[in-house]
């Protein structure tokens, strides 16, 4: 707060991490006079996630608004169950702003892309796609940013073509993701927290956590199919 909003972004980028979306969102409450209510921030973040899940459900599942809302709330609860640090995501502002809005951006991106893929081609759709691309590339969910390349490959193989505007979007996504991944702060943080690749114990811990998360994610998919 003392060094200013934009200098704070640069400070985090150079000394902590490259996830500029999280840094940007987490800094907003500190520049709003009188905003000292973590509950309000968490509520806004959670509401945005529920809204994005609702839009996703409405886009891919043809059911009425009431049932769409019920399914959206149910899926949101399952997402929390599948999160190993669920309490942190719900109650800690930093973790809340780190993951919930970024996941919401991904769901909105997929929903909008589905509309474009099925023939809708309005300028507002592309503006939304570009805006979401900027947010996703700067998030901690970099694996999702890279996985979108699969969509591009699918279009090239199955449709034998790809929209020029989508090529621009993927170009933005790739460049901005590299800006995130190659941030000086990432290396600084790894050094400070002693996360060395040669540490066998750390690697096994990472593997165990990864397997746990995969099991939880598959359980979410299983329950979703039961709907």
Write out the residue ranges for each language-model feature.
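Short hydrophobic alpha-helices at membrane interfaces in multi-pass membrane enzymes
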Residues: 115-134, 164-168
